[in-house]
UniProtKB/Swiss-Prot annotation:
Residues 23-49 form a propeptide. It is found in: Secreted. GO terms for molecular function: ion channel inhibitor activity; toxin activity. Expressed by the venom duct. Keywords: Cleavage on pair of basic residues, Disulfide bond, Knottin, Neurotoxin, Oxidation, Secreted, Signal, Toxin. The keyword Disulfide bond applies. Residues 1-22 form the signal peptide. One of its GO terms (cellular component) is extracellular region. The presence of a 'disulfide through disulfide knot' structurally defines this protein as a knottin. The modification Methionine sulfoxide is found at residue 61. This is Conotoxin King-Kong 1.
Amino acid sequence: MKLTCMMIVAVLFLTAWTFATADDSSNGLENLFSKAHHEMKNPEASKLNKRCIEQFDPCDMIRHTCCVGVCFLMACI
């Protein structure tokens, strides 16, 4: 009896946790699919196509856009 009650409480807790931490519970899959469709129609919008900055070129310390290494004193090293 105790084990059954503990299992029910655990399932309810995990269900509540899932809903509480969800990014967008309304139309989540619909938004995901429409975004993917937009990226297929416009490859420039894809996050995978973002270019990185080569070594010793000027960089932006906020966005971390260096290909290898880090941005230090406005240059990728």
